[in-house]
Amino acid sequence: MSNANGNSNGKQNNDLEDLQSLNLLLSNSNNNNNNNNNNNNNNNNNNNNNNNNNNKNNNNNNSNISSNGNINYTESQTFKEHPIGLPKPVQEFVTKLMTHRNNLIETNAIDKPFLIPPSKEVVDLFKTYKKSMNDANGIQDEDQDDTDDEFALLPDDHYDEELILDEDYQDGNDENDTNNSNNANTTTRNNTTTAIQNNALTIPNSSSSSSYNLIEAIGNLNNNNTLGTTTTTTTTTTTTTSLPDLNLNFDSSELFKKFKNDNHQNHDSNINNNNKILNDGLDVTNLLKINKEYQEFIKKYLQKIEEEQKRNKEMLAQARKSIHVTIGPRTIKGGGFRKKGIAKEQLDNSDSDNGGGGNGGGFDDEYVNCSCIGTCICIDSNGQPLFKRKKPGIPYFSFEVEVDGVIQTHYPADNPDSENIRITKNNMPLYFKTRRWTKKESELLLKGIKEKNLQKKLYRLSEDKLSKAEYEKKLKQIQRSSNNNNNNNNNINNNNNNNSIKDKQDFVAPTMQVISQVCVESLTRSPLEAYLRWKNHDDPSINKGPFTKEEDKKLLTLAKKYDGHEWEKISIELGTNRTPLACIQRYQRSLNSKMMKREWTKEEDEVLAGVIKLHMHGERIDWQEITEYIPGRTGHQCLHRWHKTLDPSIKKGRWSPEEDQCLINAVNAYGKGNWILIKNHVKGRTDVQCRERYCNVLDPQLTKIRWTPQEDKRLFDITNKVGIGKWSDVAKLMENRTDNQCWRRWKQLNKSSNVLKDYQEKVSKKKEICVSNFSGRKHERSELTVDDVIEIEEKLNPKSNKKTKTLTSTTTTSTNPTTNNNKTDNIDNQCGKNNDCSTFCGIDDHYDDELLQKD
């Protein structure tokens, strides 16, 4: 806000708003007057004589002014544009002023000055007109300074737009308050005017509602030229302006109260001046005084704000002076030195004894060396450090110790919360938004990488300085190689086919950038997903064929060497283009005997039965959910254990003749081998029970007579040829004997020899070191024998392991085996003699729980 004696152009905007606000106040007052005229017809009729007298006096005054001042008066056709009685030059000036203001509003240039300085002629006419009107009404000019000012028509000082009168008080539109006050103690004033009936000063509307302080005489003239008698009610409105807490709270109601009381006290003596009183009980002179009071108050308020701002600037300047700004060590480029952690001033004064003086000052040992980057604020204006070095001790979070040239970082011990968090995070997957790769996506990835590598080849070929013949020759080779790769994209199954791997040069080692380009062009996968997919599955150089016996043997050796870790190294040393993931899967599922359990315990059977009852939904069972309750068991193991052994609907014990007949009829209908379909016709029996019953008892091709010496000799020959333990192969060569018959006969013939004892030890050892439970995944069974596993253990631990007698294809020493014709095997009801048929119906077809080895 500018001062009172400031630039006139800078204070003109708010003054027009004052003029417009007064117009709004007068318009509202006239509206209320019209309403009050309708309600107070009796009072108006009583005062008609006074009004007529006043009209005559006013007309005489106007004629006197015209004759004495030589002023030509022109009544405007529309009073809303100019008040009646103003000289024509003044009216033209006001019209010009309003037109200029409207143009600024339309061009959105409100911030520019809008008032035009009046000419000397207009000022003189207005002064004469004002003096004549005041003399006619008996009013003395209170502010003579304004009449001497050539800008008397212009507004006074600026004021804050926020400090405005209450809207209800200015507008006077609260009819309820007006009616209530009319019924209470009210003061009736008769405003007698002479020139105009039911007209008021109208100025272009404005959004501002501040008090009026422009063209004081126009307002007085308007009041003097208002025709009719109106009865107004004086109400007390309290307006308190809230300002920031600087002990300058201002209550405008005190000013209003003061001026209103003065008007009431002087009402009887100044009855002739009632035409100056507005409908709200305040005349224009009092409003101007209130405006000046506001201006004085705002000036004080702004002065105090400026003082506070100046004080803040001084305090900020003092604070900046107290901090010595130094260029940090990493920004020092001159002087030919650079030392980490020490500023330039410190280096210049590092030899000082007391650590003070100069611009920078040296530091004592008790202070911390500055290690700031950029600007340093660690030293004061005297060059002394602001912070002292801490006493030596162990840091709270971590500390480093150098041992044998190696820096070791030590951290505090984990609390229970950090341990739980670490366990939880270790079990969380690295990537959550996973979805299965489709065949089309894999083909697009393969095609994209091939095209990118082909582009590289062609670019390198174009960069080589070759003759035309050499260029065409190499180009044909590249095209031929590309066509061959299109025909053999997925034919690499093992590492033995080295030539086929070399032909896959179009797919060798794509970078992350290449895969990112492929994803942008053809895939909806992220580059990381595509990279992992390529490295672990889609790369044609990956060996996806079945593991050979040599691979299993070498893999088992490397896994024991690295103690089940370092699978990347294991995959490289294996040398068969297997991925680390494929190596660990093969070891854990087929070679690690400690990974999966073999025999079911009674406790496991009880847990399995209870969990199935809890999680069975009709006939559907989620076996992967069941495995969470039984550690060390797979879903297939739980499924087979339940359906083959623990299901309460399974019958156990001797077979009845009716069951045998149903089994024979089903075998004749479906054929030998379709045991899944056959079991549906034998209620309560499993497929394994049906197979064992038919193959060992009911098969008409079986020979149930005693073993002859010729059969015994043939059994020994076949066993020596095939190997001990492969009883299924032995039974096939014997033709009319089952595997179980062959095993039991061989056991009976060698019960007194060491061969049987060695074989039993071998079977026991196999249970410990070999994986034998492959239910539902027979294709994962390894070809390694127990002898191979024992050989590997002896190579890795030759001293700790005792020498184990390796049993190979054991042969008997007796050429004439002892036969006991009096002792024959009665196998008519083998399954019936054992109440628990599960021993003969195991997952791995182990007909003898301890000794029988099934291939």
From Swiss-Prot:
Where are the coiled-coil regions?
291-324
PANTHER family given for it?
Answer: SNRNA-ACTIVATING PROTEIN COMPLEX SUBUNIT 4
Q: Where is the Myb-like domain?
A: 596-646
Q: In terms of one coarse class, where is the protein primarily found?
A: nucleus
Q: Where is this region: Disordered?
A: 26-72, 169-190, 221-240, 480-503, 800-828
Q: Where do Low complexity bias regions lie?
A: 178-190, 483-499, 806-824
Provide GO CC annotations from the record.
Answer: nucleus; snRNA-activating protein complex
State the superkingdom. Answer: Eukaryota
Q: Top-down, what is the taxonomic lineage of the species of origin?
A: Eukaryota, Amoebozoa, Evosea, Eumycetozoa, Dictyostelia
Database matches in SUPFAM superfamilies: Homeodomain-like
What residue ranges does this record give for the DNA-binding region? Answer: 567-591, 675-698, 727-750
Q: Name one GO biological process term.
A: snRNA transcription by RNA polymerase III
Which keywords appear in this protein's UniProt record, sorted alphabetically?
Answer: Coiled coil, DNA-binding, Nucleus, Repeat, Transcription, Transcription regulation
Question: Which GO molecular function, any one, fits this protein according to its record?
Answer: RNA polymerase III type 3 promoter sequence-specific DNA binding
- The entry's protein name is Myb-like protein L
Q: Please tell me whether the keyword DNA-binding is annotated for this protein.
A: yes
Q: Gene3D superfamilies per the record?
A: Homeodomain-like
